Regions:
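Active-site proximal loop and beta-alpha junction motif in alpha/beta enzyme cores
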Residues: 1-20, 25-169
């Protein structure tokens, strides 16, 4: 499985892009249950996946032989570096942290620079995220303690919301 999501169930083709993602893990577990490629039992079927970052354990709730929902227990996550800064021409100094949860993430509070995380700003958010990722990977020494993972793959922005349905999880 990989990013963008694709599931290979036979052979060893060359896989480009990222090699792991949470939604790919959920999709793979669902596919394995629904195609009968794993022994299926109701109400739950456990599926274990081996990914480049480690073992991912999934629990598939099965109804009438179909995957109804999937929960995952991902690889151990941790805070790698805290309170780092980069400077951009447009946004000035931006503080961020680097965390790990299957891959490395740069975590940015968008409120510090006045960037509203609204749909109308998606192009600006994307552009800034790509710039942050590039600069971080060019300037910060990143090395997983025991896996061969040495780059930030994703930038995640967060901000407060007044939407009562958003729980920040």
């Amino acid at each position: 499985m990989g990013e963008s999501t694709r599931i290979v169930y036979d052979g060893f083709p060359e896989l480009t892009g990222g090699t792991m993602c949470g939604h790919g893990s959920i999709g793979t577990a669902s596919m394995l249950v629904e195609t009968g490629m794993v022994p299926v039992s109701e109400p739950y079927t456990d599926v274990v996946l081996d990914a480049p970052s480690g073992v991912i354990r999934t629990k598939v709730r099965v109804e009438n032989g179909r995957a109804a929902e999937v929960s995952i227990l991902n690889v151990p996550s941790f805070l790698y570096k805290r309170d780092l800064e980069i400077t951009t021409e447009k946004w000035g100094t931006i503080k961020y942290d680097i965390s790990f949860g299957g891959s490395f993430f740069a975590i940015v509070n968008a409120e510090q620079i006045g960037l509203s995380l609204e749909r109308e700003n998606v192009d600006e958010i994307t552009k800034l995220g790509m710039e942050i990722r590039r600069v971080v990977n060019e300037t910060v020494d990143i090395k997983h303690p025991y896996l061969d993972i040495t780059t930030v793959d994703l930038v995640e922005f967060y901000a407060h919301t007044d939407n009562p349905l958003a729980d920040m999880k």
